[in-house]
Amino acid sequence: MVMGIFANCIFCLKVKYLPQQQKKKLQTDIKENGGKFSFSLNPQCTHIILDNADVLSQYQLNSIQKNHVHIANPDFIWKSIREKRLLDVKNYDPYKPLDITPPPDQKASSSEVKTEGLCPDSATEEEDTVELTEFGMQNVEIPHLPQDFEVAKYNTLEKVGMEGGQEAVVVELQCSRDSRDCPFLISSHFLLDDGMETRRQFAIKKTSEDASEYFENYIEELKKQGFLLREHFTPEATQLASEQLQALLLEEVMNSSTLSQEVSDLVEMIWAEALGHLEHMLLKPVNRISLNDVSKAEGILLLVKAALKNGETAEQLQKMMTEFYRLIPHKGTMPKEVNLGLLAKKADLCQLIRDMVNVCETNLSKPNPPSLAKYRALRCKIEHVEQNTEEFLRVRKEVLQNHHSKSPVDVLQIFRVGRVNETTEFLSKLGNVRPLLHGSPVQNIVGILCRGLLLPKVVEDRGVQRTDVGNLGSGIYFSDSLSTSIKYSHPGETDGTRLLLICDVALGKCMDLHEKDFSLTEAPPGYDSVHGVSQTASVTTDFEDDEFVVYKTNQVKMKYIIKFSMPGDQIKDFHPSDHTELEEYRPEFSNFSKVEDYQLPDAKTSSSTKAGLQDASGNLVPLEDVHIKGRIIDTVAQVIVFQTYTNKSHVPIEAKYIFPLDDKAAVCGFEAFINGKHIVGEIKEKEEAQQEYLEAVTQGHGAYLMSQDAPDVFTVSVGNLPPKAKVLIKITYITELSILGTVGVFFMPATVAPWQQDKALNENLQDTVEKICIKEIGTKQSFSLTMSIEMPYVIEFIFSDTHELKQKRTDCKAVISTMEGSSLDSSGFSLHIGLSAAYLPRMWVEKHPEKESEACMLVFQPDLDVDLPDLASESEVIICLDCSSSMEGVTFLQAKQIALHALSLVGEKQKVNIIQFGTGYKELFSYPKHITSNTMAAEFIMSATPTMGNTDFWKTLRYLSLLYPARGSRNILLVSDGHLQDESLTLQLVKRSRPHTRLFACGIGSTANRHVLRILSQCGAGVFEYFNAKSKHSWRKQIEDQMTRLCSPSCHSVSVKWQQLNPDVPEALQAPAQVPSLFLNDRLLVYGFIPHCTQATLCALIQEKEFRTMVSTTELQKTTGTMIHKLAARALIRDYEDGILHENETSHEMKKQTLKSLIIKLSKENSLITQFTSFVAVEKRDENESPFPDIPKVSELIAKEDVDFLPYMSWQGEPQEAVRNQSLLASSEWPELRLSKRKHRKIPFSKRKMELSQPEVSEDFEEDGLGVLPAFTSNLERGGVEKLLDLSWTESCKPTATEPLFKKVSPWETSTSSFFPILAPAVGSYLPPTARAHSPASLSFASYRQVASFGSAAPPRQFDASQFSQGPVPGTCADWIPQSASCPTGPPQNPPSSPYCGIVFSGSSLSSAQSAPLQHPGGFTTRPSAGTFPELDSPQLHFSLPTDPDPIRGFGSYHPSASSPFHFQPSAASLTANLRLPMASALPEALCSQSRTTPVDLCLLEESVGSLEGSRCPVFAFQSSDTESDELSEVLQDSCFLQIKCDTKDDSILCFLEVKEEDEIVCIQHWQDAVPWTELLSLQTEDGFWKLTPELGLILNLNTNGLHSFLKQKGIQSLGVKGRECLLDLIATMLVLQFIRTRLEKEGIVFKSLMKMDDASISRNIPWAFEAIKQASEWVRRTEGQYPSICPRLELGNDWDSATKQLLGLQPISTVSPLHRVLHYSQG
């Protein structure tokens, strides 16, 4: 292929004066000869072709010189083609100018605008930047630029040209959503001073930030050239604007124009028509009706409409309408009949009220503003079309040509109209745009012009006046026939004329219908509109006329208003006043000039007055005692508060008590104890309760009233308090804990905000007796608090930063209590609970104890801190301040305070911009910027005034959505009262921007539209905060919370799907109905009343990706009670008050009306205070009653509320001296225990080696001589025992280096025939050798720290002597206790002091003769040394020392046989043991497999010891308590015995035990050693898996029947027959692989993981089994993926590794774990 002569050449063509034909030829010649051409000069250009050298700017000349671009004229192209070679450009200089040389300054104005400062040189120029390039009007080869764009920014500038003419330029920043190559275009269009010639320039940018910066700099450059900014567009400048900009300029033209007389008369007429209609109907002026009341009234209309359809009685309908007339007071009497026609009229009335209030927003202080103000308030361009013009005649002809009536129509006037948002949002791309007619009463025209045509709220056949409307559902109706539209255009009351609208309607694909369809709310699928075909002679339909219906407002664009009349209309003269001049309105502003003037109040503010806090003598009347009992389950709590106070006055008083709570609380009980009487409060509707209270006080009876005055204030009116009487008030409430990361916080406030107190204190309920007010719980009164805590996961820590606590706890349960002498000061009470596995979702289901009802609670706290980027580094914060007229007054001052405080919290990494908005908007910067100082931004906020007209927030949102951020996210903080114009468009823009923009709303003002702001935040993936003027003390925290969320990743669009198997069940009652967005460390609680539901699915979007998680529970795990019922009821009530029941405000209000009766019902059933209900109780008093009544025994009443569910444990943190002085029970009180004979039974134990934590020496350890031991008795508390015996205990220890519990014993350690040398290495073998030698008798156990993912063992219960008074318990180890056993009296010389589990002795006494060190058989002496560990946990192990050296009758007797080589003589103290093992047991898991994680009683037995090889180790007997749970009793109700053989080949091999009738204990081979490998591998199928058969269970020591039963209960049947069998095979194969893996790891063969056991590198080590393992591993990997997350779903464990280890007994398991039943299932 021959290359053209212009190959590798790129020509920039600037041939302004070349004829059009030659331009085309030039372009064609370049292409045909291998060249390329461009109209813009860029670094790739090799040549520039000019027909006049003067067209080059200085910047272009510099660029040409720098890039070595050749300059030539067009002849260079043509002569090079003629000679077929590339000629030298030196001979082809550009053409010189003609004879007339323009002045120097004219060259700049007639050529391209200089932009030297804008475009960087080629070294720094980005690839996406194209310099501004000039185009002449005659230039046709303009590069392709997207035409489907929107204008984000625009400006017009003017300057005087050289010849005295005006030069104008319009600069636009255009945004294209579809074009990736040209997303942002800066376009400028110049009109030269001759008024004829124009030129264009453009620049393309890739990001909104670059485009905004370029736009700003370009305007500045134009100013340097003498251009001045114009505020309004002139007609000439308007012609320069793009078509899209001209649509936006409708409002500009409207605001800058003066009114013609015709337009002024029209505005006055429609305004008078609307106001006159309202004045005729309403009892009070329209501007005194709240828009919130209008929304409620519209909701009532929808409710009445539904009731009408359901056939409610006329009486019931009238009752419902009464509420409507209360909200919207009417003149005259109410109509007796309620029908759809009445509802339609009232709906139109509500819309008219709403429209007029919105229109009047700009002139709130003027009841009758001038015509120009009314016109501008309409926000709609209206122009009069002169008669006899072509446009007038054309429109008149179009209207009349489809008039099928015989009555003539007289078209009086035509007005051209245009609305900005209709022009910008009109869906013309749907096609099939037709001009159609819409008729409406004159009084509705103001609203239509202001907000456009809306979808009707009540859509039904409205009777004779409107024949067809509603026949095609809820849409906007049009007709192409004037005769049809006239039916709806009624003559006005003002001048008797009618009005008609002509609209462009984008019908798109229209579906013809012949039958009515009332259910339509949108066009049928695949269509954009519907057409009701009119009936003709040949076609039978349901429609009299042609009806066109659309269901989207953006398919409509108004064009004309037709003013007309018909024969019979009475035309009246209407002469509006000539008051047309607009007076500038200047509201009064605060004169604050400093940021300090806008400071928010501190969170804690002291009261400025003591009013109401004193008695007649001025003395405070504080409470005497405050006692709190509480119960915390998961993250919810129930709290009971007891308050005691006395009337020290000699006269009866009315006392009122302010009870402070946070907004999460719900009071659910109120009781009073006075004069020996118990008064229980009842929930009644508020008016009824208050009336009952007043009557009781008047009659001299005692009365108690409690109501909710604010979210965090409850008021108790105690009523008549007799002189010297003591009253105990008992209040019960439920609440939710605050969550800070993985820490749950319970807080009990001591006082409330002073302004809330003062308001409640000053309210007067009765005037009979003196009123004394008690303002706070008290500062120095007696205070006590006891709470139980129960978690589904391990409690990491518990502490209070306000009080010193004592506590007792297990892994998942705890009881805490304040120390004696505590008081409650202004800090309140705070409790912090460290939670593990807090991010696991969970489900709680509670059955009601008295009725058929189930309440569900979902707990969901997403861990958003994982794998999410730091949002703050690339985020923008846009503070949008509402400056509309409705914000005037104190509301605007508060808005400024909030905006300024938010500004002060913006991070250094965040970009910031401030926008003031009203009808228009003003921004601080042209694009968000990093700011080093807040001064400029703060001054911008402080300078704002509420004079910007209406609340057109949609314009600001549209602008921001067009200039979306290129990186990171944008966060809008909206500060507004929520009375927005065009709410639907605003909502659409918020949803459209959600991928890159989040919206956080701050509601201000007592009349704020909270629903609108809440729904904007919900759809904008943000959160709404309402700033209540009554609770300013919380404003700082509210703002800080919002600003924290701005920098946090979020989880939005959260939804819950409840599993309801019965399709006929009613719709689930869920709260919140619309789940708000969640942010870092947020916790979601979703409640519901859903019957028979055990599973729910949570769906959410995180970074616009959908995530799902399934949570479930089982029938067995359902609890019984009322706490979750009360919480669910409170959540529904809260959602009723502050939630989103429906996106549409009217439907939301209708649902509120529907739910009101349910809310009252829930309130009464669950004893919950709401805005409709109160507690009231009346105490009837006798006249002869003693003036000094009996004081109630407060301590007894409080003691009845016992929350301590760990009574068997001792308090931690209690002073040691206090423990020593406690009364002790004598050991003789313990019951007599005997051992029943056991039948022959084999008991398998765990295979894991018994190991102990290697203790570390703590620096806190102090060695101290024991000295003389005082006599003591049984039932010692922990502190005293530890102090006396120098032993310590901790419940949970960190694992360290381990050693086997039973070690090889050297000969020197067994040289004597004493029990102790054998016992020492057996039990205390972790001790150093020196310790073993000197103190072989010391007993200590260590424990492992428990690790649990969800739940852990319930703490063991311990019992005092009174619980064993019923005689001997069968199955104990009494018969195995030796007659006498020596007791070790001290620890080793160097006892370890790191957390470990020691044995603690209790229940014994030593006589005074026992003060000397105890001598043991064999000559060993224990050294009397001790160590104390006050920081360690409470004891779990208890050894009892009998008080009597005689045989222990209470525990039976032991009679050694004659063959026994050793006989123990009675010694100073006999030893028995009452040992309880927690989950992290003192004994390793291997020792307690039968009672894994379960409390058992351990009796330490000793046998005679001969030689090492023939010796028998100590025997441990396990005994269950008679109060253990039923599911454990099967295994634990009888004793089982363990004997460990000390084998020299293996450190610790556990055995099967046979307990025979002759009490003989036989040691059997280790269960793993006994495994027949051949038999195990023979059970493998050809495909590589194992079946879960009893044969396999025997090999694995697993009860397969129990496992089958367990899986069936957990729902494995739902997988189907095939799925169930496959899953059982998978479980069996996993178990075998884990079994093989564990066995081989003992031989030193280590596998990477359970799923990768077929590693070829280890094949040589197990050639006999490798193929089987490989085949099984491959099958497992193929199959496991079919069952994702099946382990947690079936509650087997977190994953396969942990599940199989627990099933095989290789890993400890909690007693509360569902698998515990499997492991303890009877092997029968």
Swiss-Prot record:
Residues 607-735 form the VIT domain. Residues 242-370 form the PARP alpha-helical domain. Residues 97-123, 1408-1452 are annotated as: Disordered. Residues 1-94 form the BRCT domain. Residues 369-573 form the PARP catalytic domain. Mono-ADP-ribosyltransferase that mediates mono-ADP-ribosylation of target proteins. This is Protein mono-ADP-ribosyltransferase PARP4. It comes from Homo sapiens. The gene is PARP4.
